[in-house]
Amino acid sequence: MCRPSGYAVYLWHCDAQGRYSLYSSGVTGENYLRGVSATDSSGNVTFTTIFPGCYSGRWPHMHFEVYRSLSAATSVSNKIATSQLGFAKAVCDTVYAQSAYSGSATNLAQISYASDGIFQGNAGQVATTSGSVSAGYTASITVGVSV
């Protein structure tokens, strides 16, 4: 949640195979699973996307940056905060049982939230998640940003 309203949040994450558009081999010319949205009058921001895959060495996560406005979000030098949100293992296990996420279950088995070099077990970065594979999931997290 960002107050006042109108702050921009840039969110990006990897695909079901653990690849990042623009950066990973085979998808450097593609731009997907990235988006910017402005906070509403309650300071909330919403994105519709897929559950991120799990790649070797990292716990499943989404990256985000916060900017003072949508126009400020055009340059990384304007960001006022950068962080990530992670997901509970039970949700990851359920999603990664689906065929589209075939490699993610193997990668997840090789890491823990506590051993991830970024999260290091920080429970404050785990999103609250509800839903199901068939209906879709909703993840939410409250983030404090000093401005």
Predicted regions and their residues:
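Glycine-aromatic-enriched beta-strand/loop faces of beta-sandwich-type recognition domains
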Residues: 111-124
